[in-house]
From Swiss-Prot:
Main location: cytoplasm
Gene: hemL2
Biological or metabolic pathway of the protein: Porphyrin-containing compound metabolism; protoporphyrin-IX biosynthesis; 5-aminolevulinate from L-glutamyl-tRNA(Glu): step 2/2
CC per GO annotation: cytoplasm
Keywords attached to this entry: Cytoplasm, Isomerase, Porphyrin biosynthesis, Pyridoxal phosphate
UniProt organism field: Bacillus cereus (strain AH820)
Gene Ontology biological process terms, A to Z: protoporphyrinogen IX biosynthetic process
Name listed for the protein in its UniProt record: Glutamate-1-semialdehyde 2,1-aminomutase 2
Modified-residue entries (N6-(pyridoxal phosphate)lysine), positions: K268
InterPro entries for this protein: 4pyrrol_synth_GluAld_NH2Trfase, Aminotrans_3, Aminotrans_3_PPA_site, PyrdxlP-dep_Trfase, PyrdxlP-dep_Trfase_major, PyrdxlP-dep_Trfase_small
Pfam families, per the entry: Aminotran_3 (PF00202)
Subunit structure: Homodimer.
GO molecular function, one term: transaminase activity
PROSITE patterns the record matches: AA_TRANSFER_CLASS_3
Length: 429
């Protein structure tokens, strides 16, 4: 049995200092019934907690660390920038360099604005969509999480799903009434919503792969249908690629599925582990953003040199060949997890999109939030705790996916499959 005495003591102290002892709810490990692990350091595919335990890491800071922990080039870039100054409140050339890379690789983006988080990106994109179209309502999908902005924290996923809250207290009714929610992968419901409210729907916002109800890819024709119905009704299509951006493919989720939105939100990978977000799209729309247009958005640390440098060094290391290797590794892990579950007769359903993998403990195919909720949460919690004992660090929620990095080796994946085999053998009915 691993010892967690230092993590337990640190969490006891933290609970007097921060709400629930954490700065983001899912980190409290509530849904898996254990004390959170306090991490001390990471290198490559491994992380180490303050008790000295080593883990193969599939959290990767919830997705940003696509090259693993303490990537040499990212670390050197951060050192070089920090020595010259961490923030200036004035433009820097590194902003141009990262913006050029984003524009080159993301099909929908002609102009991009850097911000500080994924939430900031989605909130800003909604304001832009409303200002550009002159309409008030937005359409989102049940279980899709787009950050904690009031308009979007309605029937959301992620930590909200983990806590079992359909929405959050503090979201005014006047805000909520302008958010229309329908089931993910249900194009007919989208069409019906446009029949009812089409003249006032400014945008549809969607994750190309729903990553905060587990990993739920789009059904064939779903994204194409959203593109068609928004164009027909004069609404904008926004892809929230905070999670999928540069994660599932070289050209992001939109390149992976061949559907180009009007606006795209980015985060996670483009900051290399530092706080960052971005939103961009057609020049005609983005030129409505201040100071070139009337739609206001600003940020003290937006485009700060540290995040821009980390993001630039992260993206330049990603090539089309990187994603061929991601696919090979992800297929290997997916097949191994499936084989272990089948061997022990454990109900399961595995979804994957590129290097994002979700394993659900249910017999039901998972294509939307209702199906995701059919998972056996008690089994997941027990599985999670056993995987920790086996030295594998997974996201502590059934409703979050696993991420791979360029640092994960075949040996890491083989060890993870072996750990899952042991865990499932202990837990089988």
């Amino acid at each position: 049995m691993r010892k967690f005495d230092k993590s337990i003591a640190a969490f006891e102290e933290a609970q007097d200092l921060m709400p629930g002892g954490v700065n983001s709810p899912v980190r409290a490990f509530k849904s898996v019934g254990m004390n959170p692990l306090f991490m001390e350091r990471g290198k490559g595919s491994k992380v180490y907690d303050i008790d000295g335990n080593e883990y193969i890491d599939y959290v990767l800071s919830w997705g940003p660390l696509i090259h693993g922990h303490a990537n040499d080039r990212v670390v050197e870039a951060l050192k070089a920038v920090a020595e010259r100054g961490t923030s200036f409140g004035a433009p820097t050339e590194i902003e141009n360099k990262l913006a050029k890379l984003v524009i080159e690789r993301v099909p929908s983006i002609e102009i991009v604005r850097m911000v500080n988080s994924g939430t900031e990106a989605t909130m800003s994109a909604l304001r832009l969509a409303r200002g550009y179209t002159g309409r008030n309502k937005i359409l989102k999908f049940i279980g899709c999480y787009h950050g904690h902005g009031d308009s979007l924290l309605i029937k959301a996923g992620s930590g909200v799903a983990t806590l079992g809250l359909p929405d959050s207290p503090g979201v005014p009714e006047g805000v909520a009434k302008n958010t229309i929610t329908v089931a993910y992968n249900d194009l007919e419901s989208v069409k019906y919503a446009f029949e009812q409210f089409g003249d006032d729907i400014a945008c549809v916002i969607v994750e190309p792969v729903a990553g905060n109800m587990g990993v739920v890819p789009p059904q064939p024709g779903f994204l194409e249908g959203l593109r068609e119905v928004t164009e027909q009704n004069g609404a904008l299509l926004i892809f929230d690629e905070v999670m999928t951006g540069f994660r599932v493919a070289y050209n992001c989720g939109q390149g992976y599925y061949g559907v180009t939105p009007d606006l795209t939100c980015l985060g996670k990978v483009i900051g290399g582990g530092l706080p960052v977000g971005a939103y961009g799209g057609k020049a005609e729309i983005m030129r409505q953003v201040a100071p070139s247009g009337p739609i206001y958005q600003a940020g003290t640390l937006s485009g700060n040199p540290l995040a821009m440098a980390a993001g630039y060094e992260t993206l330049v290391q990603l090539t089309p060949e990187s994603y061929v290797e991601f696919e090979r590794k992800a297929e290997m892990l997916e097949a191994g997890l499936r084989k272990a579950a089948e061997k022990h007769g454990i109900p399961h359903h595995i979804n994957r999109a590129g290097s994002m993998i979700g394993i659900f403990f249910t017999d039901e195919p998972v294509i939307n939030y209702d199906a995701a909720k059919s998972s056996n949460l008690q089994f997941f919690a027990a599985y999670y705790r056993e995987m920790v004992e086996q030295g594998v660090f997974l996201p502590p929620s059934q409703f979050e996916g696993l991420f791979l990095s360029t640092a994960h080796s075949d040996a890491d994946i083989e060890a993870t499959i072996a750990a899952a085999e042991i865990a499932m053998s202990k837990l089988k009915a």
